[in-house]
């Protein structure tokens, strides 16, 4: 009988390299926020992959980057702390972008912080380029990480090679117990997941500066007194400037209604029940650089 393996895998890379989409594909359901805007993941989301002979706990970190705000520095510290605590690091590099200084800097950070941790290089977004481009990127990644790291191409969107990535990561794990019961897919509290789903809906189609300036806090979750099949969710969306508040709300409140409709559909899937979603937008000036406000908003 094969020995059961289990452990923690950290997916790292520059912002917007497909880490959250890959986490969701590996787990088989949505546990991490995805957005075309960089730097949208702010919590270490753990997704859990269950099989008969192994269990992978996936840690989806913010993209490592050179920070410009106190929030950025705290996100980087979170990533480095995670490096030191996991069994395998999965370095995500997209097939459709040339390797640059940012990728080299991250490899240096990994080597400095966790020199003995197993490194697997994952070439993401292979559905976006022809096969010859994928092959060229595999060679370039091999030169970047060296012979000791295994390299796997994958498309989280189409599902191509997702099972191979799972097998490679599982093979690198040590023997160990199942940390989570079968069927549990994430250890994030439901309120955190709800806040992330609202944030994802609010980020769709907005200007580049907004992702960094938007935080969502779930204020209250209550079952409706006169209805067993309805839950009331009240959430606050914090931005840094009045102009950003206008972007979120839109003309006559149209955009906020769209955000509410999209987020409510996702939250109803998460909770398995009907939801009344109340969204309010508030300005918390320069919260990204204010330690007290960062703490209040969960950072």
UniProtKB/Swiss-Prot annotation:
Positions binding GTP in this chain are 13-20, 60-64, 124-127
Keyword set, alphabetical order: Cell wall, GTP-binding, Nucleotide-binding, RNA-binding, Secreted
What ranges does the record give for the region G1, renumbered to this chain?
13-20
The Gene Ontology terms for molecular function here are: GTP binding; GTPase activity; ribosomal small subunit binding; rRNA binding
Signal sequence, renumbered to the chain: none
Region G3: start and end of each range?
60-63
Q: Which PROSITE patterns does this one have?
A: G_ERA, KH_TYPE_2
KH type-2 domain: from which residue to which, for each copy?
Answer: 206-285
Is the Cytoplasm keyword given for this protein?
A: no
Q: Which domain of life is it from?
A: Bacteria
- Report residue spans for region: G5: 154-156
- InterPro entries, from UniProt? G_ERA_dom (IPR030388), GTP-bd (IPR006073), GTPase_Era-like (IPR005662), KH_dom-like_a/b (IPR015946), KH_dom_type_2 (IPR004044), KH_sf_prok-type (IPR009019), P-loop_NTPase (IPR027417), Small_GTP-bd (IPR005225)
Region ranges (G4): 124-127
Span list, region G2: 39-43
The GO biological-process annotations, alphabetized, read as: ribosomal small subunit assembly
Q: Could you tell me which residue ranges the Era-type G domain spans?
A: 5-175
Any one GO cellular component localisation term in the record: cytosol
Note the coiled coil stretches, chain numbering. none
**Is the keyword Nucleus in the record?**
no
Where in or outside the cell it occurs: the entry states: Cell envelope; Secreted, Cell wall
Q: How does it assemble?
A: Monomer.
Q: What family name appears in the similarity comment?
A: Belongs to the TRAFAC class TrmE-Era-EngA-EngB-Septin-like GTPase superfamily. Era GTPase family.
What's the stated role of this polypeptide? Exhibits GTPase activity. Binds RNA but is probably not involved in ribosome assembly in mycobacteria.
Cited PANTHER family: GTPASE ERA (PTHR42698), GTPASE ERA, MITOCHONDRIAL (PTHR42698:SF1)
Q: What is this protein called?
A: GTPase Era
């Amino acid at each position: 009988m094969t020995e059961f393996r289990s452990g923690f895998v950290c997916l790292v890379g520059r912002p917007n390299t497909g880490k959250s989409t890959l986490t969701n594909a590996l787990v088989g359901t949505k546990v991490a926020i995805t957005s075309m805007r960089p730097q949208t993941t702010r919590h270490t989301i753990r997704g859990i992959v269950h099989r008969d002979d192994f269990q992978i706990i996936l840690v989806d970190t913010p993209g490592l980057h050179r920070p410009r705000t106190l929030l950025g520095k705290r996100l980087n510290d979170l990533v480095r702390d995670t490096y030191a605590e996991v069994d395998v690091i999965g370095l995500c590099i997209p097939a459709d972008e040339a390797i640059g200084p940012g990728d080299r800097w991250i490899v240096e950070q990994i080597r400095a912080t966790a020199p003995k941790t197993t490194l697997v290089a994952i070439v993401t977004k292979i559905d976006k380029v022809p096969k010859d481009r994928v092959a060229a990127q595999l060679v370039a990644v091999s030169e970047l990480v060296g012979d000791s790291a295994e390299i796997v191409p994958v498309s989280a969107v189409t599902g191509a090679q997702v099972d191979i990535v799972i097998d490679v990561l599982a093979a690198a794990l040590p023997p160990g117990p199942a940390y989570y019961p079968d069927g549990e897919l994430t250890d994030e509290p439901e309120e955190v997941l709800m806040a992330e789903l609202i944030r994802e809906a609010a980020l769709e189609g907005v200007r580049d500066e907004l992702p960094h300036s938007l935080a969502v806090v779930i204020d209250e979750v209550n079952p409706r007194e006169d209805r067993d099949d309805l839950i009331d969710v009240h959430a606050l969306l914090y931005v840094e400037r009045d102009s950003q508040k206008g972007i979120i709300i839109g003309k006559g409140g149209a955009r906020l209604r769209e955000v509410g409709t999209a987020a409510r559909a996702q939250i109803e899937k998460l909770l398995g029940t009907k939801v009344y979603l109340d969204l309010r937008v508030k300005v918390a000036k320069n919260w990204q650089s204010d330690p007290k406000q960062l703490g209040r908003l969960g950072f």
